[in-house]
């Protein structure tokens, strides 16, 4: 239980700090490497991670902003990689 509490505190410190990104946690695209964006966690929009851009056939969000985006993304999906577009395929949107 003590270890769990320490992990929770560590995650809160990381989420609310403005320091360097060490674990892939980010605030904005500029903190992520090439080929990635700072996307919201699927579990909490207050936590964001550096996530790879979408490849051919992968799910995407049609309203996702281009990279780099200076604001905070609300989606857990990054835009498609260069040369790909996010288009409807059946019930979902996919990079193609």
Swiss-Prot record:
Entry's Gene Ontology BP terms: endothelial cell proliferation
Keyword Signal tagged: yes
SUPFAM superfamilies in the cross-refs: Colipase-like
One GO location term (cellular component): extracellular region
Disulphide bridges: 26-38, 32-50, 37-78, 60-86, 80-95
TM stretches of this protein: none
UniProt cross-references to InterPro entries, sorted A to Z: Prokineticin (IPR009523), Prokineticin_domain (IPR023569)
Keyword vocabulary terms for this entry: Disulfide bond, G-protein coupled receptor impairing toxin, Secreted, Signal, Toxin
Pfam families: Prokineticin (PF06607)
Main location: secreted
Localization per record: Secreted
GO terms assigned for molecular function: toxin activity
Tissue: Expressed by the skin glands.
Signal peptide interval: 1-19
Source superkingdom: Eukaryota
Similarity remark: Belongs to the AVIT (prokineticin) family.
Chain's role: Potent agonist for both PKR1/PROKR1 and PKR2/PROKR2, and inducer of a potent and long-lasting hyperalgesia. Also potentiates capsaicin-induced TRPV1 current, when tested on DRG neurons. At subnanomolar concentrations, this protein both induces potent chemotaxis of macrophages and stimulates LPS-induced production of the pro-inflammatory cytokines IL-1 and IL-12. In vivo, potently stimulates the contraction of the guinea-pig gastrointestinal (GI) smooth muscle (nanomolar concentration).
The name this protein goes by in its record: Prokineticin Bm8-a
Species annotation: Bombina maxima (Giant fire-bellied toad)
């Amino acid at each position: 239980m003590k270890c769990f509490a320490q992990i929770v505190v560590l995650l809160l410190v990381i989420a609310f700090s403005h320091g360097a990104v060490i674990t892939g946690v980010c605030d904005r695209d500029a903190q992520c490497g090439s080929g990635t964006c700072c996307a919201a966690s699927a579990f909490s929009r207050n936590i964001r991670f550096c996530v790879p851009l979408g490849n051919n056939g992968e799910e995407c969000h049609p309203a996702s902003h281009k990279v780099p985006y200076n604001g905070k993304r609300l989606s857990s999906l990054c835009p498609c990689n260069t040369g790909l577009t996010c288009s409807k395929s059946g019930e979902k949107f996919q990079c193609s």
